[in-house]
């Protein structure tokens, strides 16, 4: 029985109860959200190391995903395992293995072993990889793709990205809608190239019922990928993007009827003035399915600092209702990220998600910020470290340049909070400034 099927029968599962406790909401709230398809809990029972269940969707905190995985040029399994550890250490709510080089099955197994949070994959990468090794990518059969999906389910993958909206009809819309950067989704591009070369329909769309059968068997959440997402501001919110979203909205309903959890992936390169519209359109067309976005990236020109640019867009999108942010790293658009890049990306997007939670009125986020302010006013450094999103970094910076006073080394005896208190109460909590 899937989480969705259990929720519809009125059953509160162990995972629902866990999510409710973590989020500070009632188990019934979570159950109702899952039953309605507005919350998903990626949870494949075969993922034995998964202990930190995550709820993604409306009424819950904004989540962050961290991508990792090998590439054609760089295959270092231990480094990818380290990336997974680093991502989880700094707060990634889920991780995705996007490996395209080396022994993909072995790499996935190693990452599953250390992934205490849900793990996602993009099965077409492995299906393409196998076909390319045998002959060429275009030789991939539909059966081979579904075989890979089945294998991922058996191994314990919790959610899979499937580019079901890249249909022949939507590719016609794309071809008739001039773009600056074409198709930028790797999985979507692979599927589109395969379809155009062979003149065949997307098997994930044509055989969607088969996909649902596999997903239901392993309770794999379907992450319906946006293969036609815009890859530049010039292409944002165009006809191809919306045409694909309309198709995805229909498939969300089919997934729900089949008892399969589904969330929807979104852009991408979107200017700030279009972020709200993109979130609202997605929620409207998909029956408020959880929205999992890449960024959003509000400028095309931040190469080397896309994690910062993406966090800006992600915070705004989260405020408007996006449910999970896929991080960007400093290496985005430039190369395969290192563990340090992963750390920087997760930190930037956890801050963005937290900012969105505050704006959405999340009670726990608001309380944490209030307590931080109180500790700051008291010059309670241990209290501040405990409440900081990243305590170790806060402590390191404080101790790196200490002060002779109780304040920090920026103001020292000129700390305004201390000075005002000194006047109001007739004494200071530390030394008054001297010449």
UniProtKB/Swiss-Prot annotation:
Top-level EC class: lyase
GO biological process, alphabetically ordered: thiamine biosynthetic process; thiamine diphosphate biosynthetic process
Pfam families listed in its UniProt record: ThiC_Rad_SAM
Pathway, per record: Cofactor biosynthesis; thiamine diphosphate biosynthesis
CC cofactor note: Binds 1 [4Fe-4S] cluster per subunit. The cluster is coordinated with 3 cysteines and an exchangeable S-adenosyl-L-methionine.
Domain of life: Bacteria
Catalytic activity as recorded in UniProt: 5-amino-1-(5-phospho-beta-D-ribosyl)imidazole + S-adenosyl-L-methionine = 4-amino-2-methyl-5-(phosphooxymethyl)pyrimidine + CO + 5'-deoxyadenosine + formate + L-methionine + 3 H(+)
Alphabetic keyword roster: 4Fe-4S, Iron, Iron-sulfur, Lyase, Metal-binding, S-adenosyl-L-methionine, Thiamine biosynthesis, Zinc
Positions with a binding annotation for [4Fe-4S] cluster: 408, 411, 415
GO terms of molecular function: 4 iron, 4 sulfur cluster binding; carbon-carbon lyase activity; zinc ion binding
EC id: 4.1.99.17
UniProt binding sites for substrate: 67, 96, 125, 163, 185-187, 226-229, 265, 292
Function comment: Catalyzes the synthesis of the hydroxymethylpyrimidine phosphate (HMP-P) moiety of thiamine from aminoimidazole ribotide (AIR) in a radical S-adenosyl-L-methionine (SAM)-dependent reaction.
Name this polypeptide is given: Phosphomethylpyrimidine synthase
Name of the gene encoding the protein in the UniProt record: thiC
